[in-house]
Regions:
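Conserved acidic
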Residues: 1-220
Length: 220
């Protein structure tokens, strides 16, 4: 309240004003069920698994797709950055990502840079980290989860495939061998749409207790 002499006087209100923020942590158990497969969505990514044993047969195969460096590439492709660091963060992050490509997979150098790249996402939700920006965290994880859900839906509906497991940056499904090429085509179109790259692995069998306890047998 302003008085005639220009002095500001405080005034108490009968009904206190309350602001709500940070509500992204309210939903602790968000999930969807699609074709009898439950997908749990959360800050740590999407998760889901069908308990049991699944084996390759004469007519069906097990395909596993994994997003290459999902969290870093979502940030780089979509120009997502911690607000206080500015958009130049994306350029530096991309340079760091390209540096990793100079070293073969499995080498100490490659693994060290991979750890640094992925740590940015985790540290973006750490109050003691210079990367702290919860909005950045949510943009990355929601983008990744919805993008993967979109791809899983397309493969299940168009290929009549059955989801087996989904875990953070990838998923497995049981599919007729005659429809493998169709699935690969769907993935290729998805890659163009979202700007991410998928890595394919074929399994002979999967023995699943839950999303954190399973054994996969490679085809070769």
């Amino acid at each position: 309240e302003y008085l005639d002499n220009g002095v500001v006087k405080s005034r108490s209100k009968k009904v206190p004003k309350i602001s709500y923020y940070g509500c992204y942590n309210v939903a602790e158990t968000l999930n969807v069920v699609f074709k009898d497969f439950r997908i749990d969505l959360g800050l740590g990514g999407l998760h889901g698994a069908k308990k049991g044993t699944i084996k390759e047969s004469e007519t069906h195969s097990i395909m596993s797709y994994d997003v290459a460096s999902m969290y870093p590439n979502i940030a780089i492709t979509n120009r997502v950055y911690p607000e206080h660091l500015g958009e130049s963060f994306c350029d530096s992050y991309e340079d760091f990502y390209n540096e990793r490509k100079k070293f073969s997979k499995g080498t100490p150098e490659n693994l060290a840079i991979k750890l640094g790249l992925n740590s940015v996402y985790g540290k973006s939700n750490d109050k003691y980290s210079p990367f702290l920006d919860p909005m950045y965290t949510m943009k990355i994880t929601i983008n990744g989860q919805l993008s993967l859900c979109m791809l899983m839906e397309q493969i299940v509906l168009q290929c009549n495939a059955r989801l087996i497991m989904a875990n953070t940056d990838g998923f497995e499904f049981y599919i007729e061998k005659s429809k493998e090429d169709l699935a690969k085509s769907i993935v290729a179109d998805w890659e163009k749409t979202v700007g991410l790259q998928m890595e394919l692995v074929m399994y002979k069998a999967m023995y699943i207790k839950d999303v954190n306890n399973y054994v996969s047998v490679y085809e070769d």
